[in-house]
Regions:
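Gly/Ser-rich catalytic serine loop of serine hydrolases
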Residues: 159-162
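Nucleotide/phosphate-binding catalytic cleft detector across ATP-hydrolyzing
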Residues: 1-29, 34-42, 48-156, 168-284, ...
Length: 329
């Protein structure tokens, strides 16, 4: 089988990244599916086309995200999403021929039934073989910084729906922790930052704002936002400083700093003092799209009292790690 017919996917709640083995191109797909509102729902669009309707979908359609909190929330939709990506990036293959091999990232805290659900989903999408790789192992392999593989590396991956941290050595995850929260604001990932900011804006200025504006504020692309004041019954514009943003999301930053401290302590207990020695030499590595939040690295450094390094392109670390792991096979 041609190696180019092997697909690597970093499956995320907000974004999914896709690479073909032997091809340097990287596809970024919003993890969104647009369906009709009737039952059973009909798929109308997948990816960017669906994501564009998230803020103001018409009454007769729904925009859904099959992946949530590191789990497949809607298996049927996820399978159709996979089939769409297959056709887009592989082209059509006449049935009943099987599609090629698939390697997927999976959260380290995933239960056996959750891993089986991912494997079953891949097979239902007609992949011949499905392999799962722990996300933290992929993130560690994707780091540009050269850490000897036999040294323990502390990796903190901050995604949209959840944050996880672990100690990785020789491609194996030795210890790991994940922050899940039923209430998004109680989490430690990108969605928690968004909700915390939105709540702070509403409490401070009495304004209701859309998710797209909060996301731009979070990424540092804008400091002025327009929101609707229910009390004054009009739209108002306010300017928000970086210092205000940092203060607003401080609860989320504190949970991430605590996660770092806990996973280092876990590593020392299970692996030994070599974990602290490696952290002193190389630092704790922040990866994932949520790691780009301004002030996060400094806050963790000052609160957890450890050196911190931000991956060069944190949102692509896991998919690049899958490429490197596959190249070693």
């Amino acid at each position: 089988m041609s190696m180019k017919r092997h697909l690597l996917i970093d499956l995320g709640a907000a974004w999914t990244r896709i690479v073909r083995v032997g091809d340097s191109r990287l596809w970024n797909e919003p993890s969104a599916v647009m369906t009709s509102a009737d039952e059973p729902p009909r798929i109308l669009a997948v990816g960017a086309e669906a994501d564009a309707a998230v803020e103001r979908p018409p009454d007769n359609i729904r925009v859904r995200r099959p992946q949530s909190e590191g789990r497949i929330a809607e298996p049927d939709l996820a399978e159709k999403q996979f089939s769409f990506w297959l056709q887009r990036h592989f082209g059509r293959i006449a049935l009943p021929a099987l599609y090629p091999c698939l390697t997927l990232t999976v959260p380290c805290g995933a239960m056996e039934y959750e891993r089986k659900a991912l494997t079953d989903m891949g097979r239902a999408a007609r992949f011949m073989a499905v392999k799962l790789v722990d996300e933290l192992a992929a993130h560690a392999a994707g780091l540009d910084e050269q850490v000897p593989p036999d040294e323990p590396t502390v990796v903190v991956a901050v995604g949209a729906a959840y944050a996880q941290a672990g100690v990785v050595r020789n491609g194996a995850v030795l210890t790991q922790r994940m922050i899940h929260a039923k209430n998004t604001r109680d989490g430690a990932a990108g969605n928690a930052v968004t909700e915390e900011l939105r709540h702070w804006i509403n409490k401070t200025f009495g304004l209701s704002v859309g998710e797209d504006q909060v996301e731009r504020l979070k990424r540092g692309e804008a400091h002025k936002i327009v929101g609707y004041s229910v009390i004054e019954e009009c739209f108002k514009t306010v300017e928000i400083t970086d210092a205000q943003i940092s203060q607003a999301v401080r609860p989320v930053l504190a949970r991430l700093a605590e996660l770092v401290e806990d996973v280092i302590d876990d590593g020392v207990r299970s692996v030994g003092e070599s974990v602290r020695e490696s952290v002193r030499r190389h630092g704790v590595f922040l990866t994932g799209g949520g790691a780009k939040l301004k002030g996060l690295a400094d806050f963790v450094r000052e609160t957890a009292h450890v050196p911190v390094a931000l991956a060069a392109e944190p949102e692509e670390t896991a998919i690049r790690g899958l490429q490197r792991l596959e190249a070693r096979q």
